[in-house]
């Protein structure tokens, strides 16, 4: 569908070109922009259009359109909003999803734009109402009902006792105090979310100066705050229980109807099974599902037909007295997941979203059609950047090979050599922002047997439980490894075959040839990676069809070693080949083969020449993340998407799944029961199986289990993260209540990049013993391919001491976690300094600063962790106020029934007397202050003071 900009209202021209919200109010049947400062402020007598523009990772924009109808808006104004929304969608390219929003029945997506809630005010423009500014009049006591676990629907109800019930949460806003009444049948998550509304009311209508009280349904007059609350209603009286008719009021089964909009009328379409083939591209359809109605617009329809279908949907709702129903309008090719799920089977839809690359092609095609020379305009798109690992790559790695019911710890020289027929368990510890972090994972080779996989899962789970769930857990399959895995191993070799008894038995039973790698045999390796800290040698079939012009290869047979360089490779690829030669064949010279100039011997080893690919093996790109709350009931997984999520959406009582297509994260709250916690990996696997977003997710997609309080940065990067929030004690409701009542809000600073406090893989070791994990040969044998020992010694004096001692200098790769190795030569050193450095290289063995992967003693590691955690701490921490008001310990805990008033909830310990402080913490205040911050928080958490 093409439209002229003359058909578009001037208020809509040039919109939707940047990430964010744009809002219009309908005034005299025209859209009038609402200033940003008034976004979220709605009047009951008005209609609004809301455009949410989201910048996607592929460079394009996604547009979501909503038209909001106040309960007192006129029918004509509502119809205008509906038609203008269709017009705005056409101006944006005809891809937006359009939502009809009715006051009191808003979608969770709309409410997520205006957190914590929408509280419409009386008044309106078109209706002749006067806008009422609440802050300008005397305070009126109001009662609100709050519903929702993830976003809150707020509705004002009459200030009478009969408005209260056991199922919901109510907020009573009085002149001097705000009460939150928690119905006995309401859940913790709803109570926590309602507290966000309490905070909003406190800040908006009381300028932040107001007391807050929480009243539990069932507490009588003996409770002071409960007594005060019930006194405002004229005294306590039992609330009636919900009747059975109320319970069953929404259980009516609705019949799905399909109607075709044809020449201004609606025609019923009969069907036995709702199939995609019923929809024709040159027509519009209404899919009536009862609570919501969908309008499907074929791509071949005109703007006028789409406007007519939109008007027909509005009229149908009015005629059937269903003004509160939601209407979702979708365009062919851009249907929502919920719409597709209504059909028996929906065919795969090609990705129609335009990226910046598509746009460049369209511009070039236009210029070419006008006779212009576009040579040079259509440059190849810049190569996509390697994803950041968001993990410190200088930690300590241990690897076990699984063999039956047991596991064998591999030596440091063998831990980066994996076999495709085996399963492995790895444990990686590294320094985080404020504590040591740990990742425990399993790696399943493509040809590993089920027996070993089951054993690996069991053994890794026991290690995870032994760590008291304070580590992250990963389940990885060969060929689908995330970037974190590669930078942890740095130099990785994956060989054919396997060494486990399970694999050997499997090939014996099936009569399969054992192709396990033999050092002196025939083998071909594809070399890949992005640098010295992320490189792999993957053994492939030793045939010429395994070659690819975009890669370099190593081929060996006995003492014969070839390197093969594809025509599309880079200097970095050549560097990686040299580095991998130092690992695979360190003692033998190699013969270089350029593509197109190979020797006959090279082709003979590969069984003759044949066709091969020149396209780089594709990698899936990370998609925009989606967060889902998960409920596992009788082996059935139910999920609900959380739109425009924040850290505050992660409730301590729940399990959430974060899906970014290339990786899947399962987040487990601290308050989740042990049985459900142990099923976290099952939840991740079920999520992949159901493929809720219809992404064609692979069952081999990496799954990470993340526990609250131990979130790694490669998870927290999806949020604006405040680590203090995840370390607080108690339920999500108790935590938010402490903040709302105490008036102290945790810091909302963005997460800091983790920088290792020490250089190297294991900072506690003596530097003279350190060596790189990517070298399999002796550290004493400092060998660089093609250089004499003397030249090597001279060159080493000029090289960065933290550089790996491999064949060629590493490329200048930007590192997220740069090593902080030994002192470097000044950038402009004198000639004498250079001579002195050269001389010292010959006077004794070079003292390597390259890290070693042998684990230090527990005592040394503990000292390192504590010392490392204090580095970078502010030296200007405020002193404890010795003259602070003193409270007993019982009144300072987060679970106290009689909490101390007007305290800083982030420093509860400073209100303890010196005697009680020493008794509870087992140390003096001075000793406590000298502890690293993470250890202070852990002790406070254990004592329920955090």
Swiss-Prot record:
HP domain sequence ranges: 881-946
PROSITE patterns, sorted: HP
Subcellular location: Cytoplasm, Cytoskeleton
Gene Ontology molecular functions: actin filament binding
Keywords in alphabetical order: Actin capping, Actin-binding, Calcium, Cytoplasm, Cytoskeleton, Repeat
InterPro entries in the record: ADF-H/Gelsolin-like_dom_sf (IPR029006), Gelsolin-like_dom (IPR007123), Gelsolin-like_dom_sf (IPR036180), Villin/Gelsolin (IPR007122), Villin_headpiece (IPR003128), Villin_headpiece_dom_sf (IPR036886)
Coiled-coil intervals, chain numbering: none
Annotated family: Belongs to the villin/gelsolin family.
Placement of Gelsolin-like repeats on the sequence: 28-109, 152-219, 274-339, 641-715
Biased composition (Polar residues): 765-777
Main subcellular location: cytoplasm
Compositional bias of kind Acidic residues: 874-883
PANTHER family with a match to the protein in the record: VILLIN, VILLIN-4
Domain of life: Eukaryota
Record's protein name: Villin-4
Disordered as annotated region, ranges: 744-789, 801-832, 844-902
Gene Ontology terms: biological process: actin filament capping; actin filament organization; actin filament severing
GO terms for cellular component: actin filament bundle; cytoplasm
Function: Ca(2+)-regulated actin-binding protein. Binds actin microfilaments (MFs). Involved in actin filament bundling, severing and capping. Caps the barbed end of actin filaments and is able to sever them in a calcium-dependent manner.
